[in-house]
Amino acid sequence: MIVFATILFGALSAEDPDVEKLDSQEFQRAVEERAFALGPEDHAPAGGEGQGAAGHRELRHPVGRAPSGGAGSDLEPGPLKVYDESQKVTGLLKPEGGGEPREFEYSYPEGYDIARVLNEANIPFTTDPQTAGPWARAIAVMAPFVLILLLFFLMTRTGRSASQSSRMTDFGKSRARRMTKDQPKVTFADVAGADEAVQELTEIKEFLENPQKFQKLGARIPKGALLVGPPGTGKTLLARAVAGEAGVPFFSISGSDFVEMFVGVGASRVRDLFEQAKQNSPCIIFVDEIDAVGRQRGAGLGGGHDEREQTLNQLLVEMDGFDSKSGIIMLAATNRPDILDPALLRPGRFDRQIVVDRPDLPGRIKILKVHTRGKPLGEDVDIETIARGTPGFTGADLANLVNEAALLAARHNKEQIEMAEMEEAIDRVIAGPERKTRLISEKEKEITAYHEAGHAIVGALLPEADPVHKVTIIPRGQALGVTMSLPEEDRFMMSRAQLMAQLSYMLGGRAAERVVFEEITTGASNDIERATKVARQMVTRYGMSEKLGLIALGQHDGQVFMGRDLHAQPDYSDEIAFQIDKEIRRLVDEAYDTAEDLLVRNRRLLEKLASDLIEYETVDAEHLRRLVEEYAVDEHPSRGRPAMSVNGHRG
């Protein structure tokens, strides 16, 4: 653009150095002396065609055409040229002392009657309203450049059209990413806490390496395996480990990558994906979050003909259509197996469902060892203690815990990660970071202290409740205070007594407020919500209601649009619903009365613990144990308490 503008400016401002510029006096003198080179004869015959205003000769030429001679001519003598628009006169001057005629140009002023002057002097001339001024020169100069730019634009447009056409052609191509040897390799050694899943997937690796081992026994390798489990348990990591161990092409794609706004694109991508897989057999196809495309059919807004269902239909055909000896194995992962289409889960498609659950204590120890590998740990760091203090944590939670501890150690300018950072990281993962700068009034601080003390005392005195690990009134996350507890061991079921103790523990904060202040606050809203949910499950799911008995209430009708759990239709009468509400209220009231009775009989313990919380802000398990031994009226047998906790209660 800069070069273009420079050339244009030069063309507009350029002047011909061979043209002699005449001023008014010089032009008048040339007229008087007839110094113009007019041709073989220096005078024009009188009369004839083309008479001007004064009856003298004026030669007219068509607009846009100029006679020979003048500007741009071959310097042949001829009549002068008068340009009315630009008010210029051009022509040739007689040579002085021999030589060639000289070209001249004269710009006459506004209102000057040039035709009258030339007619009176009997000088022939032609008139032309068009001017070959600077714009004409600019156009002449720029024409080649404009043509070049036009050709370049046309070539670019053609290339772009071809590219767009190519993109439209590739729109139906699979977006699967193929793992290459250059990418970081993940093996089964990097997977911990999922031994059963690793064992199941190891068979797939062995089949790809040595299929004859299975085929000679008449065994048919599973065509597909579905990894099922909560978020963060390592389903995708397991698939990557299979890719790293198998040494075969590995195609990875997300379930949402199949579906687009255009009809037929999803099915086309499925066909293309399996075509690529057949060309690279043996290989593995991994579909992450397959529930995005594999939801049960017939419940969408498209009337059974939406794009997602057509994609699923094509996927079902491809999975059951390719030869079992082709060496193509399908892996998929989901945390919502309940909403998948039954046809997708039948044998012959996904023959196996591999459950990847939350790790138990040995699994957490292994996972922590994997994530602390290569990190400088202090001598006081006990991996087993951390694992005991994190029941219910997934592999992703533990990885985040170790990373938070490393960040805290770096913030404190330490060379190693110590146990203090690990404990703080657990608290941050459970309840959020501390908010010491949050300003609360002394009255709110006192209410919070008694509220959390109520939770802690009920949890400490009820033998069926989980042991209390820490109580703090330092705001964390959205909570003004937190009481943390944890089970003594991994728990996979709960008794009715444990659930009732959990209800009393949840309502201990509200009971403490009423006992001490004879007033209640909004601080127990989350406690009440959680307690109501537990009580409802006891009545409608667990059959723990004495009046309603062993019956499950509130069955789902199978609607799967946006997930099965969205639509639940009561399968009981209004009378039963009334009894359910009464039973829920009875259970909650019973648990609340238990908590209130404990706090009334242990008022001195409540006052002392609240006072220590106001003074120290945080009370650990050992401090609480000493207070219980000293002030409790009816202490239950003490239980061994681990040094850490996870099940945070936000009061």
Swiss-Prot record:
Q: What does this protein do?
A: Acts as a processive, ATP-dependent zinc metallopeptidase for both cytoplasmic and membrane proteins. Plays a role in the quality control of integral membrane proteins.
Q: A GO BP term, please?
A: protein catabolic process
Annotated organism of origin: Rubrobacter xylanophilus (strain DSM 9941 / JCM 11954 / NBRC 16129 / PRD-1)
Assigned protein family: In the central section; belongs to the AAA ATPase family.
NCBIfam families associated with the record: FtsH_fam (TIGR01241)
The gene for this chain is ftsH
- According to UniProt, the name of this protein is ATP-dependent zinc metalloprotease FtsH
Q: What is its EC number?
A: 3.4.24.-
Residue ranges annotated as transmembrane are 135-155
